[in-house]
Amino acid sequence: GSLVLLVGGGLMVRSVVTMLNTDLGFDPAGLHASRIMLRARNYPDPAAYRSFHERFVSSVSAVTGSQVVFSSWPPFVPPPEHLIEPDAGEAGISGGAISVSAGYFATFGITVTQGREFSVEEASAEAPVAVISETLARRLWPAGGALGRRVRDIAVTQGGSTPGPWRTGGGIGGEVRQTYDDRQRSDLYMPRTPDGRFGTFYVRSHLPGPVLSDQLQRVGEEIDRDAVINPLRLVEHDDQTLAGTRFLTWMLAGFAAIATFLAMLGIYGVTAYAVQ
């Protein structure tokens, strides 16, 4: 019985270690996140909001040498499922639709295996282009040739469906998993610079967190003294799955240690009995 417990505990620990070694397709280590909030009275239209965010990105890059990028959806949380439809009249498939700014893939450490990621001009104009995940490209066009093909996302709700514009595939993004047990996702990335009161941004920098946070606050206040920039947080701390997995690993390691001790006692007892 003790031996069975020992073997079972060892197998469980090995499974957890394997999961922790899963390649997520992006690098959360050293990546910081924060949120900007702007006062509506200072911004008469979406173009004014967009202007602030573009100036913020440009100023932070000039002051700190760090790239700031925006995303409509956070890491470690699977995005809402949309219907992703190809232009060949074929049936669409379920996948995620994420709006991101220029530099998103480089900052997150996501490989663009073919083509390129978005330019600043494309993100500002919300150009009709897209970066398609490898899994989505493979599912929509099994024979290959996703670059240059058209695709669109359709948001489906109880009230009906809302199709987005047709977009031309300009890049193929590497596989990304939002969690350690996630399947390879079929995601569609679209260019966009925030044009509203709120924006979640991400930054990777060589500067210590407190220094970087102070610099971001200063830049934001120089552009708009009413702008509110939340304190930075490390993206890897947002991973609730990893936190739970670490706890599970320690718990299983404890069980395995107990099982080892019991197994040794059992073997000692059997050996002592045989000698007598």
What do these predicted ranges mean?
Residues 55-68, 134-135, 158-249:
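"Rare, low-scoring activations can occur
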Residues 3, 34, 254-267:
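Hydrophobic transmembrane alpha-helices
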Residues 15, 247-250, 254, 267:
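Residue-level recognition of specific faces of alpha-helices
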Residues 10-135, 155-160, 164-165, 218, ...:
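Structured, solvent-exposed hinge/loop segments at the ends of secondary-structure elements
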Residues 137-145:
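Surface-exposed connector loops and short turns at secondary-structure junctions
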